[in-house]
Design a protein with these regions (language model features):
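Acidic, serine/threonine- and glycine-rich low-complexity intrinsically disordered segments
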Residues: 187-312
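A short beta-strand motif characteristic of beta-propeller blades
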Residues: 53-68, 97-105, 137-144, 181-187, ...
Length: 381
């Protein structure tokens, strides 16, 4: 026998009982896997994740409460499972247990708040202050502009852009990468930029332009590559005001106008649209994944609302009529929360009700979280 070959001892075969038990266990696992696939739309995996995540929060604990200075000008948004608050006195961040992790002092007459992945962006609309902060690092960007800040945006990877002006120029677009370093500046001496957006990766940016032709105002969207000195493309919109811009996954840009919602690629080709027809846009959110949420009203006043979710190809995914006053909407991931005068309800993207609570006394705002839970904000907490 060769020295480098080991002699193998014959192994004992497992008993019949053990083999049967192993077979039954395997069958159960296979059946469970098949059931999980077949009924994947009905299984509430987010509920399980929330249960595991919040096991350490007892009913009598104060964990999960967010204490802040209340003001009618406050703006709220979710951040990393916690909360971001922009107020007249600055920007505050809280983790998922309600512990304040950052507090940036800044005077803001009209605070506007947006969040990315780990960074919250707050600025004073029409003022000169912009702040960005994360829960782990605190302040990551401070801008004190000599001219008014007209708009700002933050991408899913925390890239940032904002609009202002400089002497001799009508508009200036500034773009920062995900490490909040300034990488691009576009100066326009001939055009007024009204809105801006930046894509994840900070390779692309966009600005809504208000111009004039034949005595009538004309809107357009200008697309930029931040590694080029030339305009990438210009998308004509027509004589409709542009309310908002937002880059979607795959570098699709969403353009929200006063009369319609559009989706374009970087070449300016329209990928889909949804016309408002005779309804009036009352509120909206471009947050969430896979859809845009619109609150429409049949009249300029009154409570004849219809909540719509629109897919990125312009297809209506769901519609929810309601006669209750809508106080706030918020979206994150696959979920949407709707706060009315009578309840707080959570829906999926097709507006199928997921959960509802009638205990909303004193509530003025709500923040949807990606795991399917929501933060209800009232009376400073």
């Amino acid at each position: 026998m060769s020295d480098n070959v080991s002699q193998l001892q014959p192994q004992k075969k497992p008993g019949l009982g053990k083999r049967i038990a192993a077979f039954v266990l395997l069958a159960v696992l296979v059946a469970g896997g098949v059931a999980a696939y077949v009924f994947r739309d009905q299984l509430n995996l987010d509920a399980l994740q929330r249960y595991v995540r919040y096991l350490n929060v007892s009913d009598d604990s104060k964990s999960g409460r967010f204490l802040y200075d209340e003001s009618n000008s406050n703006q709220y948004a979710g951040l990393s499972g916690g909360l971001a608050v922009a107020s007249a006195t600055g920007l505050s961040l809280y983790d998922k247990d309600g512990t304040e992790t950052a507090s940036i002092q800044a005077a803001m007459s009209v605070p506007v708040l947006k969040t990315g992945n780990t960074v919250a962006l707050a600025y004073d609309a029409g003022g000169t202050v912009l702040e960005a902060a994360s829960q782990k690092k605190g302040s990551v960007l401070h801008v004190s502009s000599q001219r008014a800040i007209l708009d700002a945006d933050i991408a899913a990877d925390d890239s940032i852009c904002y609009l202002s002006s400089e002497p001799g120029y009508k508009s200036v677009l500034y773009v920062y990468n995900s490490q909040q370093s300034l990488i691009y500046r576009w100066l326009s001496a001939s055009q007024y930029f009204m809105r801006c957006a930046v894509a994840s990766g900070s390779k692309y940016a966009a600005a809504a332009v208000l111009g004039q032709q034949d005595g009538m105002f004309e809107s357009s969207v200008v697309l930029f590559r931040t590694d080029s000195e030339e305009i990438l493309s210009t998308i004509p919109i027509g004589n409709a005001l542009i309310y908002d811009l937002h880059f979607l996954p795959g570098n699709t840009i969403c353009v929200l106008c006063e009369d319609a919602l559009y989706f374009y690629d970087l070449d300016g080709q329209c990928l889909g649209s949804y016309a408002f027809e005779d309804a009036y846009l009352k509120d909206y959110t471009l947050d969430g994944t896979g859809s845009v949420t619109l609150v429409m009203n049949l009249y300029k006043a009154g409570n004849r609302y219809t909540v719509l979710t629109i897919g990125y190809d312009g297809t209506m995914l769901g519609a929810l009529p309601t006669s209750e006053q809508i106080l706030d909407i918020s979206a994150s991931g696959r979920y949407l929360t709707l706060l009315t005068s009578g309840s707080l309800a959570i829906y999926d993207q097709t507006l199928k009700e997921y959960d509802v609570s009638d205990n909303t006394t004193g509530a003025s705002s709500a923040v949807m979280r990606e795991d399917g839970s929501a933060i209800l904000l009232a009376n400073g907490h």
